[in-house]
Each structure stands twice: as structure tokens, then as C-alpha cells.
């Protein structure tokens, strides 16, 4: 039994990662193509560490650029292909990529902070919340994790800054994905 961030894990099996700002550089203008997708320093190696530790690693990402018409589905697939190839170069693979294509105005069930993506992930592998941790760079990631009963870690490599939201006193905020993996 492991305790972390106020949550107790029976057995941690699954790490859910946001994409933009956690795995790759984010942009206020959105990441719209594979050419714009650049891994953050150490992020892919951190994913490899998780995989070598025997953990399932899944991406859960809001991609409202699709709903806004900023890029097409094929461009998103090309970004994900680039990401998975670079991770594959380290001898490991992601277990899944889940994304929401909707804008906030769509009021869908899948866009974080709603729990739809996390519910889908837990359903796919028959997981309980105590088996998962979410690592994200945005308050919406933390809100979704809390609503789903999942422990979370925030990273400053994206939207979080040194004056983090104080609503989550039980949520560690660290510099980047590598530092988050060190906490697990």
C-alpha cells in the first residue's frame, strides 16, 4: 500500500499524462502540426523510466484546435505518430492516446476538467482510481483528476507557474515530467 498526495494506492499501475506542456512544448497559438511538436527536455526519457518500471502510460489531452478548425485530424495523427516514434526510439511504447476534440463551449463530457477521458481510460483497463495518477500542467488536469478520484501531480513546464492555485494543497507541483516521475 502506497500513500501519495493524500491518495492511497493499492497498486499504482497507470500514469495518465497530459500532452501539451507535459510531454511537449505548448503554445498559446496551439500545436498544429508535427513540425511544431517538440518534446520537452527529458520528457521522453521520463516516459521510458515509467515503462521500464512496469507501469502503463496513457496520454489524455484536450485538443480543441480540432474543434476550432485550426488543424485537421490527419495533422493530429501526424503529431501523435511523431511522438510515438520518438518514444519508440527509446525502446518503449505508450499504452494509449485519448483526446477530446471539442471546444469548451461544446460542454462535452470528455474535455478536461470533465472526467470523460479518465473514465474511458479506467474503463478500458478495468482500473480503479487508486491505481492511477494524473500528471498535468494545467488546473483543468488537476480538476479532472480530483473529480475522478485520481491522485495528481502538477508540472511547471506548461501552464502552472510559481504562484500555483492554492486549492490543491495535497497536489505536489514540480518542475517537469522527470521530476514528477521522481516523486512516484
Describe each PLM feature range.
Residues 109-142:
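Conserved Lys-Pro-Asp/Glu-containing loop-to-beta segment of HAD-superfamily phosphomonoesterases
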Residues 69-84, 109-121:
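Short, electropositive alpha-helical surface patch
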Residues 134-172:
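Acidic, Mg2+-coordinating phosphoryl-transfer loop and its flanking beta/alpha structural elements
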Residues 80-99, 164-184:
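Structural recognition of alpha->loop->beta junctions
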Residues 10-58:
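Active-site neighborhood of HAD-like aspartate-dependent phosphohydrolases
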Residues 1-9:
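Short, Lys/Arg-enriched N-terminal segments with co-localized hydrophobic residues
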Amino acid at each position: 500500500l502506497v500513500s501519495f498526495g493524500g491518495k492511497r494506492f493499492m497498486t499504482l499501475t497507470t500514469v495518465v499524462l497530459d500532452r501539451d506542456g507535459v510531454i511537449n512544448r505548448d503554445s498559446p497559438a496551439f500545436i498544429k502540426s508535427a513540425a511544431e511538436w517538440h518534446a520537452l527536455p527529458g520528457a521522453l526519457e521520463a516516459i521510458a523510466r515509467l515503462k521500464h518500471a512496469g507501469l502503463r502510460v496513457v496520454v489524455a489531452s484536450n485538443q480543441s484546435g480540432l474543434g476550432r478548425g485550426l488543424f485537421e485530424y490527419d495533422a493530429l495523427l501526424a503529431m501523435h505518430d511523431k511522438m510515438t516514434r520518438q518514444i519508440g526510439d527509446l525502446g518503449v511504447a505508450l499504452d494509449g492516446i485519448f483526446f477530446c476534440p471539442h471546444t469548451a463551449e461544446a460542454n462535452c463530457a470528455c474535455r478536461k476538467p470533465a472526467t470523460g477521458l479518465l473514465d474511458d481510460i479506467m474503463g478500458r483497463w478495468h482500473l480503479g482510481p487508486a491505481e492511477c495518477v494524473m500528471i498535468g500542467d494545467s488546473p483543468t488536469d488537476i480538476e479532472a483528476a480530483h473529480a475522478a478520484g485520481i491522485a495528481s501531480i502538477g508540472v511547471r513546464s506548461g501552464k502552472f507557474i510559481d504562484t500555483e492555485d492554492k486549492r490543491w494543497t495535497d497536489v505536489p507541483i514540480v518542475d517537469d515530467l522527470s521530476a514528477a516521475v521522481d516523486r512516484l
